[in-house]
Amino acid sequence: MNIQQGKVWKFGENIDTDLIIAARYLNTSDPQVLASHVMEDARPDFLQHFTKGDFIVAGENFGCGSSREHAPVALKTAGVSAVIAKSFARIFYRNSFNTGLPILEVKETDEIREGDTLEVDMAQGTIKNLTRNQTYAFKPIPPFMMELLESGGLIEHAKAKIAQGVL
C-alpha cells in the first residue's frame, strides 16, 4: 500500500454522496453492485474509462451530503486507489477510513489535471505528479488511521486484533 501509481480522474467542489453512489442503488449493500454504479451520476461514462488503481482528485468538501457508508465502499470496491481533495466532509472522512479507502488532503489539487499520472507514497506523505514533474505533500494520516487502512478497514482491523487476543 505504500506506493501507488495511477491516472487522475478530476471532479469539482462539493461532490456529494449522491453523486458518488446514487440513492436509487441503496437498496443493496453488495459492494460489487455499488461499485458498478460509482460516480455514474457525476460522469456517466466514468467506469468505461476508469482503471483500477486510478485516483479521484477533487476540490473542497468531497463526500458531503448523507452519512452513508455506501459511498466509500463503492469507491474502494471499484478500485479507486485514493481520493485526493482539498477537504472532505467529516463523516465521509471517517467512513472512508472505516472501510479502508485512503483519502488524502492536498491544497494544490487545482494544479493536478485530468489524465495526469500520480505516484502516491503513503509512508512519505507525498504525491508526485509524474506528468507535470511536481510534488505535493498531503496532510499526515494519524498512525491509528494508517493501521485501519493497512488492515482494510475497521472491521478487518478489529478481527485481526481479536485474533491476536488484543481485543
UniProtKB/Swiss-Prot annotation:
SUPFAM superfamilies linked: LeuD/IlvD-like (SSF52016)
Molecular function, one GO term: 3-isopropylmalate dehydratase activity
Record's keyword terms, sorted: Amino-acid biosynthesis, Branched-chain amino acid biosynthesis, Leucine biosynthesis, Lyase
Known EC number: 4.2.1.33
Coiled coil (UniProt feature): none
InterPro entries: Aconitase/3IPM_dehydase_swvl, AconitaseA/IPMdHydase_ssu_swvl, IPMI_Swivel, LeuD, LeuD_type2/HacB/DmdB
Pathway given in the UniProt record: Amino-acid biosynthesis; L-leucine biosynthesis; L-leucine from 3-methyl-2-oxobutanoate: step 2/4
GO biological process: L-leucine biosynthetic process
Catalysed reactions, as listed in the record: (2R,3S)-3-isopropylmalate = (2S)-2-isopropylmalate
Family of this protein: Belongs to the LeuD family. LeuD type 2 subfamily.
Summary of subunit composition and partner proteins: Heterodimer of LeuC and LeuD.
Function: Catalyzes the isomerization between 2-isopropylmalate and 3-isopropylmalate, via the formation of 2-isopropylmaleate.
HAMAP family attached to this UniProt entry: LeuD_type2
Protein name: 3-isopropylmalate dehydratase small subunit
Natural source organism: Wolinella succinogenes (strain ATCC 29543 / DSM 1740 / CCUG 13145 / JCM 31913 / LMG 7466 / NCTC 11488 / FDC 602W)
